[in-house]
Amino acid sequence: MTDADMSVLNEVFDVIMDRKNNPVEGSYVCSLLDHRKGINKILEKVGEETAETILAVKDNDRAEIIYETSDLLFHLLVMLAATDITLDDIAEEMKKRRH
């Protein structure tokens, strides 16, 4: 995987942060961030997507694993944005763990 391939995560996170700071009516991200259940709605989605990813792995369905992992990563990015944690914060923690 190249840095350019990973840049899509930064791009998606930037869009999520923009939606957080500049809400757009009808935006799915805004509907999660502004849901009446608050962070619990986002966590429900993270849990749902985690379960779907696990089932895809169990079924050894490569296409479904990729699809569900993408959904999971997206909802994890929304969760991070909601809790004011950046991808840089995560990258720094990962760097600490690689040695």
UniProtKB/Swiss-Prot annotation:
Keyword set, alphabetical order: Amino-acid biosynthesis, ATP-binding, Cytoplasm, Histidine biosynthesis, Hydrolase, Nucleotide-binding
Name of the protein in question: Phosphoribosyl-ATP pyrophosphatase
One Pfam family from the record: PRA-PH
Top-rank taxon: Archaea
Record-annotated disulphide pairs: none
GO biological process entries: L-histidine biosynthetic process
Family assignment from sequence similarity: Belongs to the PRA-PH family.
GO MF terms, alphabetically ordered: ATP binding; phosphoribosyl-ATP diphosphatase activity
Gene3D superfamilies the UniProt entry points to: MazG-like (1.10.287.1080)
Functional pathway: Amino-acid biosynthesis; L-histidine biosynthesis; L-histidine from 5-phospho-alpha-D-ribose 1-diphosphate: step 2/9
